[in-house]
Amino acid sequence: MFPSIFNQAWELSAVKDYDPEDKSGFFSSTYRAYNCAMTLICSAIIVCDRFLARFLYAKDFYSAWKYVPWLTIAILFGALSGYMGGFFTAVKDSRIFATSTLVGAVSNIALNLILTPFMGPMGAAIATTICYVEVFVVRYLQSKKYISLKLNVLRDSISYIFLVLQSIVLLTLPENFLMYGINVFLFGLVFLLYLKDIQLILCKVIHRRGRR
């Protein structure tokens, strides 16, 4: 729900304040803050997934925890795709929406046909994640035509790899101290990768409260 609300508000802001050169750094800093928050939340959910499943799911649905990591990563990339979509709304280029959505839809259908017969619901979850990643990549590459964003692509890519590693650890290791230890460690690495962005967010929040 949060990504949906944010992206709706973001589209209005992107149209109003659109600057292809991003001279003020507003669009870049907003993206970094949004990506930082969503990635950390995603990582934390993966860490706590099996623990929370005991309280949130009925016994018959407890096994649904297995699909949470991949679907959470899908939500992350869906949110970032929505952010990039704000730029296309600002420049009134609906073709990118159609193209990226079509790429994701075709990929999702193909991967579901390939993975689901062998992996069941897990195959569908993985296919959905890959689909959202593809949509994000297409929109990110196309956004370069309209705006100059200063992003740390290498740092972000490493953090996404850590999310995948967390998911693999969660799904392959038994629920014990080692499993939680590795995933908490990976969460710590993600946290350190975004430490500067976290500090920037906190400084802005404190500054705004101080002005009230």
Predicted regions: what is each one?
Residues 102-106, 156-169:
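Hydrophobic membrane-spanning alpha-helices of multi-pass integral membrane proteins
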Residues 43-46, 109-113, 163-178:
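Hydrophobic alpha-helical transmembrane segments in multi-pass integral membrane proteins
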Residues 4-7, 47, 66-92, 96-143, ...:
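Short runs within selected transmembrane alpha-helices of multi-pass transporters and secretion channels
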Residues 1-32, 85-90:
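Helix-loop junctions and terminal segments of transmembrane helices
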Residues 20-25, 91, 144-154, 173:
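Membrane-interface helix-boundary motifs at transmembrane edges
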Residues 31-39:
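Selective transmembrane-helix segments that form parts of the transport pathway or gating/packing helices
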Residues 28, 45-76:
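Interfacial segments at transmembrane-helix termini and the short loops linking adjacent helices
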Residues 149, 170-212:
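Membrane-proximal transmembrane or re-entrant/amphipathic helices at the cytosolic face
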